Design a protein with these regions (language model features):
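An anionic, turn-rich surface loop/hairpin at beta-sheet edges
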Residues: 198-203, 207-219
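Cleavable N-terminal export/targeting peptides
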Residues: 1-40, 240, 252-253
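Eukaryote-skewed repeat-based solenoidal scaffolds used as protein-protein interaction platforms
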Residues: 134-141, 146-161
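Long terminal segments
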Residues: 31-46, 145, 166, 176, ...
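Transmembrane beta-strand segments that form the barrel wall of outer-membrane beta-barrel proteins
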Residues: 41-51, 69-80, 88-90, 98-109, ...
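Feature captures outer-membrane beta-barrel proteins of Gram-negative bacteria and organelles
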Residues: 59-68, 84-98, 103-105, 113-129, ...
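Outer-membrane beta-barrel initiation region
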Residues: 26-87, 249
Length: 253
């Protein structure tokens, strides 16, 4: 019954957000002056398909809307009859003289709640700091990093047309020793295209008293105007024994 209610809520909220997108579409896309564009809602719709060893294939549909400093998202994950979960979240970006601060909150069916606080300090060369916490209820982790964690890293925009960052996400609550190191390169050859490469390595235990596992992942994303496609392959996804392949195709509007 709870899953049925979640699906109905998803349909209602998705319809509301899609209506909002029509009412607040980017005026520049209709040939109107671009000066008003930053006051409009911008949306991103991302369907994803997950193939995981030992599990049924899964799908996820994520609709994210942003206006100025505000961002909202609504999503639903389903893995055959094994598990499904609806998520809704909010994020706010605070621009500061020395960088930006981003608090976020996410709620999900099965009683899950989580939040994070992330900071970027600096501009052409910057530091990354973050803290995440959840209520430890049932949740399929689509971030693929520890949720109850700290983030520490560095980044730079000094390379031509590039943004490069190196950061670590480390469990600091559940005594699992989970740690994921990311090296991310974003390259924009022109105003219409962008490549994103995310290479990561992990080590840690699924739970505190289990054997440690190690794995790595590679994600490649290509953006062209309003459309993007992402392909990822991960060993020992979410510190399990399974490997996973992910495919996403997205549309911005």
């Amino acid at each position: 019954m709870r899953n049925g209610r979640s699906a109905n809520q998803l349909k209602i909220l998705a319809g509301w957000l899609l209506c909002m997108s029509c009412a607040h579409a980017d005026p520049a896309a209709r040939g109107e002056p671009a000066v008003a564009a930053h006051h409009a809602w911008a949306f991103k719709l991302t369907p994803s398909y997950y193939v995981t060893g030992g599990l049924a294939d899964a799908i996820d549909l994520n609709l994210r809307g942003g206006r100025g400093a505000h961002a909202l998202w609504l999503a639903h994950y389903r893995r055959a009859a094994e598990f499904e979960q609806t998520r809704i979240g909010y994020e706010y970006t605070v621009h500061l003289p020395i960088g930006q601060l981003i608090p976020s909150l996410q709620l999900a069916s099965h009683g899950f709640a989580g939040g994070s606080l992330n900071a970027q300090i600096g501009d052409s060369v910057y530091a990354l700091l973050g803290l995440g916490r959840t209520n430890l209820r049932d949740y399929y982790n689509l971030n693929f990093d520890p949720n109850d964690s700290i983030v520490v890293g560095l980044g730079t925009r000094l390379l031509p047309k590039s943004n490069v960052s190196l950061y670590t996400v480390r469990d600091n609550r559940l005594s699992t020793g989970q740690k994921v190191i990311h090296l991310v390169w974003r390259f924009a050859p022109d105003d219409h295209q962008r490549w994103t490469v995310d290479l990561s390595a992990k080590h840690g235990r699924p739970v505190a008293d289990a054997e440690a596992v190690s794995g790595h992942a590679l994600s490649l994303t290509y953006d062209y105007r309003q459309v993007f496609v992402r392909l990822a392959r991960e060993r020992r996804v979410n510190f399990s024994d399974a490997d996973q392949t992910r495919v996403s195709i997205g549309l911005r509007f």
